Amino acid sequence: MGMAFTDVLITETDATVTIVDKHFAPGGHWNDAYPFVRLHQPSSFYGVNSRALGKNTKDTTGPNAGLYELASKTELVTYFNRVMNEQFLPSGRVCYLPNSEYIADGLIRDITSGVKTRVENQKTVDATYMNVTVPAVTAPSYEIEQGVQCIPPNELPNLTNAPDGYVVIGGGKTAIDACLWLLNNNVNQEKILWIRPRDQWILDRAYIQPGPEFADRILLRQVETFEIAAASTSLNQMFNQLVTQGILLQLDAAIQPTMFRCCTVTAQELDQLRQIRNVIHGHRVERIELDNLILNNSIQSTSPGTIYIDCTSNGLARRPVRPIFEGNHLTLQTVRTCQQVFSAAFIAHVDAAYENEDTKNELCTWHSYMEGQYYRMR
């Protein structure tokens, strides 16, 4: 979000910007992501405003065939490096401080050397508030007995021997990616146990596409969605009708999802995921032992040769609501459904175009992700 904000700010104003980054290179959490990760939305929906991400082409093979490309980790990290080194730094108005952390009041510490520097600034922009985390840098919340093979998805491509089985822990996008990777690498679905504490509502990627050829059906889908919401007399009625019309997808028709994190799949991917029959719903892992998986209210027998894939990090943490504009402090948050980088760019535009803080906050209303059955659509 920080680079998307900066891109618009230096385009629409004459401001200078110091970017403080704990990572060693531009790209944020994408530097830590698993190697087979891809965007769940078309590349053109992502990136900074001044430079397109991707080639605006459609995939011709695989489960995304016929739909617009999904950037890979390599593409994303390369893209953000180019934005920084080919646009931001040559402008002379952006100073980039990698391997650094912001302390307070303009004080910055270099993580490698420990050297502290103070900068003078008119405004401070917190681009970390959404607190995006990935399993590779987040310890599991459950106990793990010594000798248990519990890995983040990053390590899957490095395995040299097939285990007795795989246990995928988590119900979000990362878990979906891990399951699809296993299936696409010829792991028998019977060898996969999927622990899903919560199920999520999923969107059909075919209806989340750029380009004029998709415009009519996407517009009709939006109209249909609002008509169903307006005509419903209860949440259950609304969700049931949205599922019936294919507007919302679910992994298991018998399980009511309780979260929405903007995850998308194709029909082929959904069929693949539904092949996994060994699923434990509504239970959380408390401890993994060599021969047992201890859940909050049950025990599942396993074997020492089982590999556990931790997908439980909170990719988008639920944070307390706070105003985006507070004096000389800006807190970047989502103001457009499922569009974090667009939100950051929009906030920068509003900051550049308007003076009154109340007006700015009115234009940039904070938007949350669904937890439980209630989801505020914007």
Each PLM stretch: what is its role?
Residues 216-222, 226-310:
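Long, internal scaffold/assembly segments composed of regular secondary structure
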Residues 22-79, 195-252:
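Glycine-rich active-site loop/strand segments that organize a redox cofactor
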Residues 66, 72, 76-79, 128-186, ...:
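Glycine-rich dinucleotide-binding loop and its adjacent helix/turn
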Residues 20, 117-133, 166-169, 303-315:
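Short hydrophobic core segments
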Residues 1-13, 155-206, 342-378:
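Rossmann-like dinucleotide/flavin-binding elements
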